UniProtKB/Swiss-Prot annotation:
It comes from Schizosaccharomyces pombe (strain 972 / ATCC 24843). Belongs to the Tom5 family. It is found in: Mitochondrion outer membrane. Residues 1-26 are cytoplasmic. Forms part of the TOM (translocase of outer membrane) complex. This is Mitochondrial import receptor subunit tom5. InterPro entries: Tom5. GO terms for biological process: protein import into mitochondrial matrix; protein targeting to mitochondrion. Keywords: Membrane, Mitochondrion, Mitochondrion outer membrane, Protein transport, Signal-anchor, Transmembrane, Transmembrane helix, Transport. The keyword Kinase does not apply. It is a single-pass membrane protein.
């Protein structure tokens, strides 16, 4: 993951942290949408019934 020998610089660490946080937020929102979809569909079906 890190290029070159030795410890990564603080800037690199910050970059990777931001990337990881962004990916986690993306994953969490996708998971939330997938979890909520059945409830939303059944809600609209009840409204139309």
């Amino acid at each position: 993951m890190f290029s070159g020998a030795g410890r990564p610089s603080k800037e690199q660490i910050k970059q990777y942290d931001n990337l990881a946080v962004g990916e986690m937020k993306k994953g969490a929102s996708v998971a939330a949408v997938l979890l909520l979809t059945p409830f939303v569909i059944s809600f609209f079906q009840k409204m139309r019934a």
